[in-house]
Amino acid sequence: MEMEQEKMTMNKELSPDAAAYCCSACHGDETWSYNHPIRGRAKSRSLSASPALGSTKEFRRTRSLHGPCPVTTFGPKACVLQNPQTIMHIQDPASQRLTWNKSPKSVLVIKKMRDASLLQPFKELCTHLMEENMIVYVEKKVLEDPAIASDESFGAVKKKFCTFREDYDDISNQIDFIICLGGDGTLLYASSLFQGSVPPVMAFHLGSLGFLTPFSFENFQSQVTQVIEGNAAVVLRSRLKVRVVKELRGKKTAVHNGLGENGSQAAGLDMDVGKQAMQYQVLNEVVIDRGPSSYLSNVDVYLDGHLITTVQGDGVIVSTPTGSTAYAAAAGASMIHPNVPAIMITPICPHSLSFRPIVVPAGVELKIMLSPEARNTAWVSFDGRKRQEIRHGDSISITTSCYPLPSICVRDPVSDWFESLAQCLHWNVRKKQAHFEEEEEEEEEG
């Protein structure tokens, strides 16, 4: 009763302006429900030593994944100065569902290359999409596979494909959604094809690891139909916007069909006096390392214009929460759920006993340059691609992109993530400790 009176008093004290910026889930809690139609999952086997996620009951969340809105009054007189112009309203990630303004008509199918085991799933999927009257886009090099080119039974379907070439054809405004057949690398490749807005991605686990590919291909027809109809759960995987500025050293930049050197978009090329700028969208991580040199890399890291540290070691990884389970995890970083807005900085074999990985807010801007004392150059890669050399005077600016990758979930963002931790990375797997027998307990007490 006292708690209810306190809530009523707090609501009365809020001014109309303040109430407009108050989260509706401030005083919510998580409750159990037997009839909630969307959220929840059945009890399943988990490889983790922890209890399985969920049970036969269904779970209804009444609190945002971002947590409750903080009370902004402190003591009897202090409060946070309100500035409505700087307040950003963010939808609860747990409630994000895919919907269509118009029925989807075109789909891009990306298949892992040089994998014969994927030919049959690829043919079955494309045939099904054609039967659903979808326009199917594939890469031209996929159709050049001898196994597909020589298959006469697949010829009628193959003639209906729309093809494109990476780094030459812009299909960003022609694709309604993407289907990936392969592993995590296939999804990373799909992300690299879209340097702006990314269509929703449905990823089937047909590769090696599959941490980012939650769908099984066994029931692909019903799952694809559900996505086409809409109302599927999605997780917005943040990407990094990376701008590389290099000093021109007597080399002209080649531009082919709107694309610059290393496949960067022409819109990302900014030819200043003596400068060349390229821009990339990165899903996992930006890696700056020493390359083939035997010397330690020596790079300065700036945050919002301030020098925060100098990295001396094999290099440094700047990753998204999605990338925290990739190279960063191998380098000793913590794993971050993709709904946590953050950027992670992880050193690679630092020559220091106190250099721990750190997590910084998603809205900061990082800038990485060779230190003036550096004995050699450095090398940078973006999701393992577009590797290039960084010299003195060059800079790499990194911040969170406004174009996330919308990844379609099997269940929901939280359940899918912990399922991947258990099934792919075998997180916290150990033999369970046996309990004491009653006689042994009595002897110890005696």
Curated annotation (Swiss-Prot):
Query: What is this enzyme's class at the first EC digit?
Result: transferase
pH dependence, entry free text: Optimum pH is 7.5.
In the record, Phosphoserine modifications are located at 46, 48, 50, 55, 64
Q: Name one GO biological process term.
A: ATP metabolic process
Looking at the record's lineage, which domain of life comes first?
Answer: Eukaryota
A Gene Ontology term for the protein's cellular component? cytosol
Q: Which UniProt keywords apply?
A: ATP-binding, Kinase, Metal-binding, NAD, NADP, Nucleotide-binding, Phosphoprotein, Transferase
Q: What is its EC number?
A: 2.7.1.23
Molecular function GO labels: ATP binding; metal ion binding; NAD+ kinase activity
Biophysicochemical property: temperature dependence: Optimum temperature is 55 degrees Celsius.
Q: In which tissues is it expressed?
A: Widely expressed but not detected in skeletal muscle.
Please write the reaction equations for the catalytic activity of this protein.
Answer: NAD(+) + ATP = ADP + NADP(+) + H(+)
Requisite cofactors: a divalent metal cation
| SUPFAM superfamilies named in the record | NAD kinase/diacylglycerol kinase-like
Its family?
A: Belongs to the NAD kinase family.
Q: Which HAMAP family match?
A: NAD_kinase
Record's protein name: NAD kinase
Organism, per UniProt?
Homo sapiens
Lineage in the entry?
A: Eukaryota, Metazoa, Chordata, Craniata, Vertebrata
Q: Which gene encodes it?
A: NADK
